[in-house]
Amino acid sequence: MPNPNQAIKKENEPIQVENPTELVRDDGEVEGYQKEEGKFKLVLSILKQCIGVKDIASLRFSLPAQLLEPVGNLEYWNYVDRPDYFAVMGDSDDELERMLGVLRWWFTKDLRFVRGRVVKPYNSVLGEFFRCKWVVTDPTVREDHTLDPDSSQLPTYKTEYSETTKFPLGKSYRPKASRTTSSQSVASTMTKSSTKTSKKKSSKKNSKSESNQDSSNDRSSTAPSTAESNNEHLSSSQKSKHSIVFMAEQTSHHPAVSAFYVTCPSKGIEVYGQDQIAVGFTGTSFKVCAGDLNKGVYVRFNKRDNEEYLCTHPSASVGGILRGNLHINLLDSTVILCPKTRIKTIITYIEERWLGKPRSLVEGVCYRYDPSNDTIDSIKAVPKENILATFKGNWRNCIFYSYAGESESRMLVDLNELDLVHKRCPPLDKQFPFESRKIWFPVTHNILAKHYTQATKAKQEIEDQQRQASAAREESHTEWKPRFFVPDEKEGRPTLTEEGKKVLEQSLSDEYIHGS
């Protein structure tokens, strides 16, 4: 087995593809690596076995290492591709603006699909664990409520491929005047949004108590939050810094289910849920959708009276298999709802044409709904008088929104200016034996060196160890229990165990050890 301490890639050094060990940093991260496409005879021979299978994700077969991306499944499926948008989504005092903040995070959380190729990560083994951390400097909020990505001071990385995914006209959508912000401009923008929200609230015949509560919210939302109003006038050393920690554990192997938890305590934000996917193969493309135990992603704002949002997953298809040009298309709809504020959002991913390049179009609506009688499931079915805002655009490029009753189009998020961000993990020699990067390092090292036979052998050894451990538990009638999470099969709300809380506290502390 290679020594992980001898395969170090410093964060700011250029990538040297001809020396693959330098692609691995001392914390085990593979920096910007996505191997060349090809080997389609091998792919097609495997796919022939998948035709007609209802759920490929439940099959027990081992892919050769050369078809895998050198990254663990738990690490790949995190929900924080842009920690800055995660940290600010609950900042606004206006409830509609908070929903728009959740939307901005939702469209940036999977930036890897925009900046990277479609890949297959390692299948997680039972009990596998992944944790990482980001430290975000209070970002500068522009007049249009988008963030200046450079102001977050996040360690980003770029690849030749990721740069080609950026639309040349992306940034030109935003006028130069709106690329900077002041406290007055933010206050003006938030006042306008509060007025629009207030009009929509008054149009509904709510009870007196609801009206009073709404009026109180409107009054408080006319002033910008402290972070927004003071941010521009502070130097980078004076700005607040916020720690974000992501934790995930493989809680079940058959079916494959993992639990995750993300938190930014200083902002009072928690995100949690369970991941499970079902995959089918039609002969020309894969269809991916949420499994039965995957109820969606929960978002909670502790500093907003525990305001909670439930975000459901869309479906997706992976096409271009026969042409050797893999691409992902999002399908169907996503619903984001908040019973406390009575605001619901429907996001619809527009069906692609049979011919031509994918357009990646999306549209949606934010509206008032009745949590006790929630029967609307399409944009067309939303009553016009309940609409608060509408949005549309390209989920790989720019998305725009308009407040109800206004013709002015505003920027929701511009993905062209965003790059992927490094994760801060402990060095390999400080990681738990069952942490993702530690478990899979022998496979990763050999894939980067293009020693695919050795990589496949190392992968099979890991899988054999898991089978032996499973057989031993079965023989001794021992039930395996997750270390860090208590799963929730009914609602998909996992909770941290005492051991999980301890690891979380350690990860949030200033003494948290991470790689260079």
Curated annotation (Swiss-Prot):
Query: What is the name of this protein?
Result: Oxysterol-binding protein-like protein 1
Pfam families xref list: Oxysterol_BP
Report the GO terms under cellular component: cytosol; endoplasmic reticulum; membrane
Instruction: Give the keywords, sorted.
Output: Endoplasmic reticulum, Phosphoprotein
Q: Name the gene behind this protein.
A: obp1
- Span list, region Disordered: 168-240, 459-501
Biological process terms in GO annotation:
intermembrane lipid transfer; lipid metabolic process; sterol transport
Q: Where is the composition biased (Polar residues)?
A: 178-187, 218-238
Q: Which organism is it from?
A: Schizosaccharomyces pombe (strain 972 / ATCC 24843)
Top-level taxonomic group = Eukaryota
